[in-house]
A protein has these predicted regions:
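Conserved catalytic submotifs in the C-terminal HATPase_c
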Residues: 29-39
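Conserved glycine-rich
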Residues: 64, 128-130
């Protein structure tokens, strides 16, 4: 069944507020100090689902602290989320968003999931005209980098 995508102007900080509440409830500390409040063009429900999926994924693999940041450039908003989990071996990073792919940590951890969560994230980002990639964070952990169109003023 095809989902109806309703792209609209969404303030980034308002969108992250929902995630902050969910993380607080789960006992995950979140730092959003590096988030610049710009407005993305995205489907509210789909973007919330993407962010929830990413937070869930980090929590599953041992993260208990997240930080978000953003940069607004011309017509694109780049939002990233870093966790304090174990990170991912460099050679596995390109495969993380493939359906049913499960890295070393997922294969050895009971109840770690089916390998579909990040594939859904990638598809959802593409449906909203954006993209997503993973890299290891400089201080350890995983950094997920998302790009979405910036909403035009007026």
């Amino acid at each position: 069944r095809q989902m109806c995508i309703r792209d609209r102007a969404l303030p980034l900080q308002e969108t992250l507020h929902h995630i902050l509440n969910a993380c607080d409830h789960e006992g995950i500390s979140v730092d959003c100090d590096a988030v610049i409040d710009c407005t993305v063009l995205a489907d509210r429900e789909l973007l919330q689902r993407v962010l929830n999926n990413l937070v869930d994924n980090s929590r599953k693999y041992g993260a208990n602290a997240l930080s978000f940041g953003s940069v607004c450039e011309e017509d694109t908003v780049t939002l990233w989320m870093e966790d304090n989990g174990p990170g991912v071996p460099e050679e596995q990073l390109p495969c993380l968003f493939e359906p049913f792919y499960r890295g070393d940590a997922a294969r050895t951890k009971p109840g770690a999931g089916s390998g579909l969560g990040l594939a859904v994230v990638k598809k959802s980002m593409q449906q909203m005209g954006g993209n997503v990639r993973a890299e290891n964070a400089p201080g350890g952990g995983l950094r997920i980098v998302m790009q979405l169109p910036m909403a035009k003023e007026g």
